[in-house]
Amino acid sequence: MEFSPRAAELTTLLESRMTNFYTNFQVDEIGRVVSVGDGIARVYGLNEIQAGEMVEFASGVKGIALNLENENVGIVVFGSDTAIKEGDLVKRTGSIVDVPAGKAMLGRVVDALGVPIDGKGALSDHERRRVEVKAPGIIERKSVHEPMQTGLKAVDSLVPIGRGQRELIIGDRQTGKTAIAIDTILNQKQMNSRGTNESETLYCVYVAIGQKRSTVAQLVQILSEANALEYSILVAATASDPAPLQFLAPYSGCAMGEYFRDNGMHALIIYDDLSKQAVAYRQMSLLLRRPPGREAFPGDVFYLHSRLLERAAKRSDQTGAGSLTALPVIETQAGDVSAYIPTNVISITDGQICLETELFYRGIRPAINVGLSVSRVGSAAQLKAMKQVCGSLKLELAQYREVAAFAQFGSDLDAATQALLNRGARLTEVSKQPQYEPLPIEKQIVVIYAAVNGFCDRMPLDRISQYEKAILSTINPELLKSFNEKGGLTNERKIELDAFLKQTAKEIN
């Protein structure tokens, strides 16, 4: 049987099509929404899903799978759940939550998923990093030995912080916790502009959790005016954002900071504040029907903060010698540091800066309680000159606070007690500092040296700030620069400094 030419042509065409036929299917695992409400969706059918995997709803809203149960999956929704209905399709993305990281992020304000919210357009060249990763192991770490200066006399002298340390800032609302954090960012400006290599530069990441949008906008303005935004990243999960984003923001910020840590650079991350993250996590856990524990927090709320703060570390020389320093902030209620979340974070961190309302209202700002504040590892990183100068400072201040409480009751005090009260009042006056005016470490050394060695003892309290300005404006720059060196305060420098301070004190008096 012979085919006509037309039929033969068709046969050839069909044969060629069949031999070149291939399937290019993309198979997505999908599920259906069983119930939705309060930002939680229960989904049936996602049998292969991973814990912490991102999913996408039919409306375009994303979510994260947190509860993997026999019958369904509990998904927390990133955004409004009003567009999600029962029976809607839910698609797996196959990826665990990740965020952009890299130097392209500097100077930008992003949300908890790394999406820019500052109106400056899309992010340029960047890599993506998972928000949840394991902290560096013991072998990969090195003990803290480099200083991380805050620019605050009270902190750098009494509770010094090193690169790679975790130092908690704890206090009631409106006691100046955020002010300490912002001053620390501003203080890096001088170091970063002077630093010729990456080993000196300190990049900053500020994570705002549950704050007002107006507060975040004000912070952006302060950093912009001080030219500090160029080395900073702001991650904002504001009060109007859903609880899952407030829970996720610290991990996202940490992933951005880890980019610098893992590439031999140095970064500082501020979590402001972790109390609000714990509240957001409690909300999610209760809605997911996880059993509540103390103060209705879930049983793993300690792990929530420990796995985050353990990622701040000083890396060993073999792994690049980078570092990530963390300053978590915790808000207390009526000064109660023995509540659940404060005790958890105190036990995780390497020390704490305790702020008190009473000191704040007495005009002692920063309102640091010297007795309760401690730095467990920072003294190893402190400059030698600062260590020499402030050796007796903490003891004298603690004794002063103790004696001052009893001095209110008795009028006839012996000469030694009066001298202690006199010196203590002047040391307290010297530790005061205006907001947004961080001091370089060498200038701090001069001021504290003058106070500890009695150059202010006969001076009226209201003249001390004037004396401080006078010595800082007229001191020999070469002498000032020498305090930054590793040698510390030599006898020749002490003699020169003593003569200068005595002369300036005479002029003020």
From Swiss-Prot:
Residue ranges crossing the lipid bilayer per the database entry: none
| UniProt keyword annotations, A-Z | ATP synthesis, ATP-binding, CF(1), Hydrogen ion transport, Ion transport, Membrane, Mitochondrion, Mitochondrion inner membrane, Nucleotide-binding, Transport
Q: Name one GO molecular function term.
A: ATP binding
Localized where? Mitochondrion; Mitochondrion inner membrane
Q: Which GO BP terms, alphabetically?
A: proton motive force-driven ATP synthesis
Please give the PROSITE patterns that the UniProt record associates with this protein.
Answer: ATPASE_ALPHA_BETA (PS00152)
Keyword set includes Magnesium: no
Listed under GO cellular component are: mitochondrial inner membrane; mitochondrion; proton-transporting ATP synthase complex
Stored Pfam families = ATP-synt_ab, ATP-synt_ab_C, ATP-synt_ab_N
Query: Which parts of the sequence bind ATP?
Result: 171-178
Subunit-structure text: F-type ATPases have 2 components, CF(1) - the catalytic core - and CF(0) - the membrane proton channel. CF(1) has five subunits: alpha(3), beta(3), gamma(1), delta(1), epsilon(1). CF(0) has three main subunits: a, b and c.
| Function statement | Mitochondrial membrane ATP synthase (F(1)F(0) ATP synthase or Complex V) produces ATP from ADP in the presence of a proton gradient across the membrane which is generated by electron transport complexes of the respiratory chain. F-type ATPases consist of two structural domains, F(1) - containing the extramembraneous catalytic core, and F(0) - containing the membrane proton channel, linked together by a central stalk and a peripheral stalk. During catalysis, ATP synthesis in the catalytic domain of F(1) is coupled via a rotary mechanism of the central stalk subunits to proton translocation.
Q: Which family does it belong to?
A: Belongs to the ATPase alpha/beta chains family.
The protein's name in its UniProt record: ATP synthase subunit alpha, mitochondrial
Name of the gene encoding the protein in the UniProt record:
ATPA
